[in-house]
Regions:
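Outer-membrane beta-barrel biogenesis signature
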Residues: 21-42, 61, 127-142, 309-313
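Outer-membrane beta-barrel channels and translocator barrels
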Residues: 36, 48, 79-82, 126-128, ...
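Residues that define the transmembrane beta-barrel architecture of outer-membrane proteins
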Residues: 37, 64-70, 112-119, 143, ...
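Transmembrane beta-barrel strands of outer-membrane/channel proteins
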Residues: 41-47, 87-95, 145-153, 190-196, ...
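Outer-membrane pore/translocation modules
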Residues: 94-217, 259
């Protein structure tokens, strides 16, 4: 039982902090602007499968995970003191199986439920004034600079008596700086930010072996992301994507485990194509290139988007 508890604890630390499903995300063209009053809804599905690297933190072998995450998302652009700005929200649902061998005993876990919701707001600082559609069609991008704030709210499924939960029972915040520059049909994007976490005050608590409560905390984690993309024609483009994040050591009941420090990177590609006036499809693939601690997954996703232009007030 001691090693099985260690396995489930490690899985909880690896997969279900708020940063986990989002720190590995690759999001090309996140700081491109759209006309004010633009709206979009997106339905997407992602599938991830791969190994789990414990970096010697636990005597666990053959640890693997496979999960699916359908997501509903909404996007809206607006005028913020003369600058282009936008806000987005995403509601994911997770279904996954996780297994490994601890003390020569195979173990298997299954979870299904709501994942913590994700929110983002960004504001252009240079190169992208707020514009209605009639002005936007005459505008040509050069250099864009912006700032953003990503927030993960504790709205996912969480049971403090279980170690594996889709929700993390805490908030996460990521302030970010974004850069985008166009050369003809090419666009270069770069983002830099950091994740900050509140404390989960009911981590694996109220159990028969531990009737009280204990806390889980996590150190900040730096995040860097870059993309280079090419436009074939309006609404049709591809990109090469990469990211790197470092930090995020975790502590349980005030005891820090230095082996849980993350120092990971992913590489992938994205493609988008417009299929109708208001509809488009997006496909993406990514894989871990260096995973010091955490899930080393291959991930594929497909999304359908419907967009429209709202009427000014």
């Amino acid at each position: 039982m001691r090693y099985f508890s260690g396995l489930t604890l490690a899985l909880a630390l690896l997969f279900f902090p708020p940063c986990t499903l989002h720190a590995q995300d690759l999001s090309p063209r996140a700081y491109l602007i759209t006309p004010i009053h633009s709206n979009a809804v997106t339905l997407s599905y992602s599938f991830s499968d791969g190994n789990i690297n414990f970096n010697g933190a636990l005597p666990v072998s053959d640890a693997k995970g496979r999960y699916s995450v359908p997501i509903f998302a909404y996007y809206h652009s607006f005028n913020f003191f003369g600058r282009s700005a936008n806000a987005a929200a995403a509601l994911p649902y997770g279904v996954g199986n996780f297994h490994g061998t601890a003390a020569d005993v195979p173990q298997h876990l299954y979870r299904s439920g709501l994942v913590d919701s994700f929110y983002r707001v960004s504001v252009n600082l240079r190169g992208g004034p707020a514009m209605p559609a009639r002005e936007f069609v005459k505008w040509h991008q050069k250099v864009l600079l912006g700032v953003g704030l990503n927030v993960i709210a504790p709205t996912g499924q969480y049971d403090p008596t279980k170690l594996i939960n889709w929700g993390a029972n805490r908030w996460a915040f990521k302030p970010e700086f974004g850069y985008s520059q166009r050369w003809g049909n090419w666009i270069l994007d770069g983002y830099a930010g950091g994740w900050f976490f509140t404390t989960n005050h009911e981590f694996w608590s109220h159990t028969s072996s531990y009737p009280g409560t204990r806390s889980q905390s996590q150190k900040p984690m730096a995040s860097f992301e870059g993309h280079i993309s090419y436009d074939f024609k309006p609404g049709v483009w591809i990109s090469l994507d990469g990211n790197f994040w470092i930090g995020g050591r975790t502590s349980v009941a005030g005891i820090e485990n230095p082996l849980t420090k993350q120092q990971n990177s992913r590489l992938g590609g994205t493609g988008a194509i417009r299929i109708a006036k208001h509809q488009s499809l997006k496909f993406s693939y990514s894989d871990g290139t260096y995973i010091r601690y955490g899930g080393n997954y291959q991930s594929v996703s497909v999304g359908w988007q419907y967009s429209w232009l709202g009427k000014p007030n």
